[in-house]
Amino acid sequence: MAASRLPPATLTLKQFVRRQQVLLLYRRILQTIRQVPNDSDRKYLKDWAREEFKRNKSATEEDTIRMMITQGNMQLKELEKTLALAKS
């Protein structure tokens, strides 16, 4: 009998899509942080983002994850607005 090729903890389609949303949000946040002109502010924001994502890594509740994605998107928009104001 052939062994299953799937790892024991295979994600469902819904979990896979949520994971992709989280990873995309994380990448977008880090890309936006790279635009921060001050080195110390950039490092602080990068460390903050990394710590927030690590702290919530173990979340499994669907509603909680969806809420955190929404909050992350709002914080990303706020950061983008702040950077746009600083440049003008």
Curated annotation (Swiss-Prot):
GO CC, any one term:
mitochondrion
Q: Report the main location listed first in the record.
A: mitochondrion
A GO biological-process term? mitochondrial respiratory chain complex I assembly
Alphabetized, the UniProt keywords read: Mitochondrion, Transit peptide
InterPro entries with a match to the protein in the record: Complex1_LYR_dom, Complex1_LYR_LYRM2
Give yes or no: UniProt keyword Transit peptide. Answer: yes
Q: Does the keyword Transit peptide apply?
A: yes
Provide the transit peptide span: 1-19
What start and end residues bound the annotated signal peptide? Answer: none
Q: What is this protein called?
A: LYR motif-containing protein 2
Name of the gene this protein is made from? LYRM2
